[in-house]
Design a protein with these regions (language model features):
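Minor-groove-contacting beta-hairpin "wing" of winged helix-turn-helix DNA-binding domains
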Residues: 1
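Glycine/Thr-rich phosphate-binding loops that ligate phosphate moieties of nucleotide
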Residues: 4-229
Length: 229
């Protein structure tokens, strides 16, 4: 979350970082919400459980069911990041019944990405004293239209996906170009951003409240005495 040129006081559950520094003596700061596991949970479905053979299969499998069937996966394989910062949390699957299928588990893993993003963004906006008006997404998971739509539903704001899905690498290239004079300003670079698809928020349900219950069950699972580096 871009918070301008004044370095903020540390906020509970958030990291303070430098968003960029153009060498003009006025770095731009940001609040960062750290989510430890997102795409790695899809890899776990593939390599650990054998539910899918390719990561690209998770989207169609997750969308083959209307919802997770009450299943929640908290992928706290290495603890929980923002806003909980709980190194003793561990991965949890709750809500399993005899009717649970691999599709429900895949759906719950995809939904966990949505819920974790909502939790981090809500903590960031509280800490920054701002209101979110839209979210721009990128990365491999952003190609899943249904997931991005659910993200818009959970946040209650439009979610915008650019034509270039790997904007982290693109941003590094832009900064290098600024340093070498390829572009004259950040504003000039901003005008190069192009929209692929805009997802407008629709009605959501109370599943996030259930997700928070699942998170509580994952927390403090280990103790300081049993955690081994």
């Amino acid at each position: 979350l871009n918070i301008g040129t004044v370095c903020p006081e540390p906020a509970e559950g958030m990291l303070t970082t430098v968003a960029w520094d153009l060498g003009d003596g006025h770095p731009t700061y940001a609040l960062e919400g750290a989510i430890f596991v997102t795409g790695a949970a899809v890899q776990w479905l593939r390599d650990g459980l054998g539910i899918i053979s390719e990561s690209s299969e998770v989207g169609p499998l997750a969308e083959s069911v209307p919802d997770s069937g009450g299943v929640y996966v908290v992928p706290a394989f290495t603890g929980l990041g923002s806003p909980w910062w709980d190194p003793y949390a561990r991965g949890t699957i709750v809500g399993i019944t005899r009717g649970t299928t691999k599709a429900h588990i895949a759906r719950a893993v995809v939904d966990a990405m949505v819920y974790q993003t909502r939790d981090a963004i809500e903590a960031m906006t509280r800490a920054g004293g701002v209101q979110l008006t839209e979210l721009r997404v990128d990365g491999g998971a952003s190609v899943m239209n249904a997931m991005v739509q659910r993200q818009a539903n959970e946040l209650g704001v439009p979610v915008l996906r650019p034509t270039d899905h790997e904007t982290t690498a693109l941003g590094a290239a832009y900064l290098a170009g600024l340093a070498e004079g390829v572009w004259g300003s950040v504003d000039e670079i901003g005008q190069m951003w192009t929209l692929d698809q805009r997802f407008e928020p629709q009605a959501t349900d109370d599943s996030h409240a259930q997700w928070l219950r699942a998170v509580e069950r994952s927390r403090q699972w280990e103790s300081a005495d049993t955690v081994v580096d």
